[in-house]
Amino acid sequence: MTQYLLSVHGSSDDAMPAPEVMRAMYDDVETFNAELQSTGVWVYANGLEPADIATVVDGTGPELVMTDGPYLETKEHIGGFWITDLADLDAAIAWASKGSAACQGPVEVRPMQPDPEPAS
C-alpha cells in the first residue's frame, strides 16, 4: 500500500458559490469522507484557510526570515487535501475523481515517499 496526497485546487478568482451550492458541496464531501473511512483507505483530511493568510518561514540562513502570504505568488492554491492509503495509482485516480466531483474542483494526485528502512 502507498499513501497518496489528493490535493484540492482552486483559484482566488473563483467566485464564492451561493449558500445552497456550498451546503450541497459540504454534504457531498462529508459523504465522500465517510466512504473513504468505511473502506479503510482514509488516513487524514482537512480544508485549508485562504492562501493569503499563510506565512513562509525560511530558517536556512543565519537569520530567520518570515514572509507574509503564500510561497508562490499565483492565483491557484490548495484549498484542502486527503491523505489516503491505496494499492496503486489507478486506485488513487479513481478516488481523486470521486473527490473532485464532491468538492467541484480539480484534484491533484501525488504519491508520498515510502518510510525509509530502519538502519541495521
Task: Specify the residue positions occupied by each region the protein language model found.
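Conserved, structured core segments of small domains
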Residues: 1-120
